[in-house]
């Protein structure tokens, strides 16, 4: 039951961060490309790599994993919004933007998970 509270708390924080980051990215870059979703996915992927590596090194409690790994990062990152925005770009005929979005999300997010893990593992 305690882990549910941590997941809920982390989720509420992650949702607020996601909203604020998305609004900020629209203000900076406009809305012609889904930079907000890309940014939250990249940040979340990096943090997931860090949390995973810390967990592997037994330096993170189950409560922190629930708070950050499931709650905060689960609410911060978004595959459904990425999918919807990519489909909208395709439906608008913006194929280059759609495939750029797919490539950036996939490549950057995988790299950021790796980078987060390596950062932690190199310090342990």
Curated annotation (Swiss-Prot):
UniProt-annotated binding residues for Na(+): 74, 77
Record GO cellular component, one term: plasma membrane
Catalytic activity: fluoride(in) = fluoride(out)
Membrane association type: Multi-pass membrane protein
Domain of life according to the entry: Bacteria
UniProt KW Transmembrane helix keyword: yes
This protein's UniProt keywords: Cell inner membrane, Cell membrane, Ion channel, Ion transport, Membrane, Metal-binding, Sodium, Transmembrane, Transmembrane helix, Transport
GO molecular function, one term: metal ion binding
Predominant localisation class: membrane
Free-text activity regulation comment from the record: Na(+) is not transported, but it plays an essential structural role and its presence is essential for fluoride channel function.
Listed GO biological process terms: cellular detoxification of fluoride
Transmembrane residue ranges: 4-24, 35-55, 62-82, 102-122
Subcellular compartments: Cell inner membrane
Family from the record: Belongs to the fluoride channel Fluc/FEX (TC 1.A.43) family.
Role: Fluoride-specific ion channel. Important for reducing fluoride concentration in the cell, thus reducing its toxicity.
Protein name: Fluoride-specific ion channel FluC
């Amino acid at each position: 039951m305690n882990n549910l509270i941590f997941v809920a708390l982390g989720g509420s924080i992650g949702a607020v961060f996601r909203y604020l980051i998305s609004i900020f990215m629209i203000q900076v870059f406009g809305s012609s490309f889904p930079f907000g979703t890309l940014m939250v996915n990249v940040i979340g992927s990096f943090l997931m790599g860090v949390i995973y590596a810390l967990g592997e090194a037994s330096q993170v409690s189950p409560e922190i994993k629930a708070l950050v790994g499931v709650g905060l990062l689960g609410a911060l990152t978004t595959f459904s919004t990425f999918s919807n925005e990519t489909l909208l770009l395709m439906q608008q005929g913006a194929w280059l933007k759609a495939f750029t979005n797919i490539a950036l999300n996939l490549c950057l997010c995988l790299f950021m998970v790796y980078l987060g893990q390596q950062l932690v593992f190199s310090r342990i």
